[in-house]
């Protein structure tokens, strides 16, 4: 069987956890392929139980599914153990979680540097979560990182941490006037934490490719979203990894020819957390309505999300960049009770119209949305389970988004629950 990639098509928080949870009962593997605990997935089970996951794949909540933290992820050991403990206390079987030996470990000095750099950045700060993600990826690229497999050899681990702290302590003490970290203490704490996860360390790329050869289905789950991609997003207001479809292959060890379906997740409106351009952002009562009705507060940061109307320009861009084959449209129910529902179909920049993503960040920062207004609907759609159950105006809205985004809207979320979903096309069915 092929691998399937699940991609956020906006600035994150699109509802990827709901999509993974919906598909999880029909796949054998769920893989997190990038990011760290700077993002969160919310899953609401049929029982009404609400789970917020930050590092562990959403498939952990589905019996029988093997979950993998892939090589593209940066893992904070303390956060991992806390999340595992929280799941186990609620009766979740966590034995089905594996961690790639090649994933990088997020160290205390990464968090310390992240926080002081953001604080000193002043007006130029980018809105980092302060969890050390960026500095950890910096060390990975600079070939100074600590990998998960290093905890299996304490001597090698100690040597690597001592080498890293020779430089990190210089930065912390001499530039930022912070206290130096003791290498022996860092090593001791990490080895103690490793006792709680080293039995999970695995050659993930081998296991995943063997699973595909056995015709098992592998679901690759991204965090954040396309517009936060370090290469394809609204740079520099981005994350430090590649949440796009290309990152799924790199961050899991599964070759690109084995990926046949790319499922993009789109919210029926647009949100963003932190700094950066946001052409359709609302500062009026409509923005307040979307924030309140949609419960728009970040799962990981607790920060209020900025809210705006649906932006078809970035949706079309996400389709192109990721090769999206299908869309899962979430939170359509939030738009009920609006007299009209605007859709951004293009931008004007210095008086000139464009329907494509601006090439430069200065252009996108000046982009003014061009809206097309569709009539709203007043009916409660949370009980709809077939497309024809939706009011005609809601169906028209979905079909217009589909046309503008350039890929089929195969699933529609009409509420937070697993069962509050309309399936127009089975994305797991053989094509």
Swiss-Prot record:
Sites where the protein binds GTP: 12-18, 40-42, 305, 331-333, 413-415
UniProt keywords, alphabetically: Cytoplasm, GTP-binding, Ligase, Magnesium, Metal-binding, Nucleotide-binding, Purine biosynthesis
Chief location of this protein within or outside the cell: cytoplasm
EC number: 6.3.4.4
Catalytic activity: IMP + L-aspartate + GTP = N(6)-(1,2-dicarboxyethyl)-AMP + GDP + phosphate + 2 H(+)
Keyword Metal-binding: yes
Binding site for substrate: 299-305
GO molecular function, one term: adenylosuccinate synthase activity
HAMAP family for this protein: Adenylosucc_synth (MF_00011)
Family, as annotated: Belongs to the adenylosuccinate synthetase family.
Annotated protein name in UniProt: Adenylosuccinate synthetase
Lineage start: Bacteria, Bacillati, Actinomycetota, Actinomycetes, Mycobacteriales
Gene behind this protein: purA
């Amino acid at each position: 069987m092929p691998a399937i990639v699940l991609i956020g098509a906006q600035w994150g928080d699109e509802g990827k956890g709901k999509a993974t949870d919906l598909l999880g009962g029909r796949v054998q593997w769920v893989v997190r392929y990038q990011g760290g605990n700077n993002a969160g997935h919310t899953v609401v089970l049929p029982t009404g139980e609400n789970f917020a996951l930050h590092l562990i794949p959403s498939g952990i909540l589905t019996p029988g599914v093997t979950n993998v933290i892939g090589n593209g992820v940066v893992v904070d050991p303390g956060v991992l153990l806390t999340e595992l403990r929280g799941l186990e206390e609620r009766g979740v079987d966590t034995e089905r979680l594996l961690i790639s030996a090649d994933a990088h470990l997020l160290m205390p000095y990464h968090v310390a540097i992240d926080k002081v750099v953001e604080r000193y950045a002043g007006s130029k700060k980018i809105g980092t979560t302060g969890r050390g993600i960026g500095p950890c990826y910096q060390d990975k690229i600079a070939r100074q990182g600590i990998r998960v497999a290093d905890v299996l050899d304490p001597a090698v681990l100690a040597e690597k941490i001592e080498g890293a702290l020779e430089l990190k302590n210089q930065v912390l003490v001499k530039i930022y006037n912070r206290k130096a970290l003791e290498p022996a203490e860092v090593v001791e704490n990490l080895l103690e934490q490793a006792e709680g996860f080293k039995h999970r360390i695995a050659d993930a790329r081998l296991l995943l490719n063997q699973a595909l050869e056995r015709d098992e289905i592998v679901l690759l789950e991204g965090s954040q979203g396309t517009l936060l991609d370090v290469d394809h997003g609204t740079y520099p207001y981005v994350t430090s990894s590649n949440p796009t479809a290309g990152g799924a292959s790199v961050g899991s060890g599964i070759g690109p020819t084995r990926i046949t379906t790319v499922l993009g997740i789109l919210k029926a409106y647009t949100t963003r957390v932190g700094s950066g351009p946001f052409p359709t952002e609302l500062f009026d009562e409509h923005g307040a309505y979307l924030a309140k009705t949609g419960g728009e507060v970040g799962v990981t940061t607790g920060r209020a999300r900025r809210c705006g109307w649906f932006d078809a320009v970035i949706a079309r861009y996400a389709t192109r960049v990721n090769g999206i084959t299908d869309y899962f449209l979430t939170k359509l129910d939030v738009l009920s009770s609006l007299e009209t529902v605007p859709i951004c179909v293009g931008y004007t920049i210095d008086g000139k119209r464009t329907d494509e993503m601006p090439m430069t960040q200065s252009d996108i920062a000046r982009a003014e949305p061009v809206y097309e207004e569709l009539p709203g609907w007043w009916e409660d759609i949370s009980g709809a389970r077939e497309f024809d159950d939706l009011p005609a105006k809601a169906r028209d809205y979905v079909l217009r988004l589909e046309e503008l985004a350039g890929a089929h809207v195969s699933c529609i979320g009409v509420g937070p629950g697993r069962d509050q979903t309309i399936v127009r096309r089975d994305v797991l069915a053989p094509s």
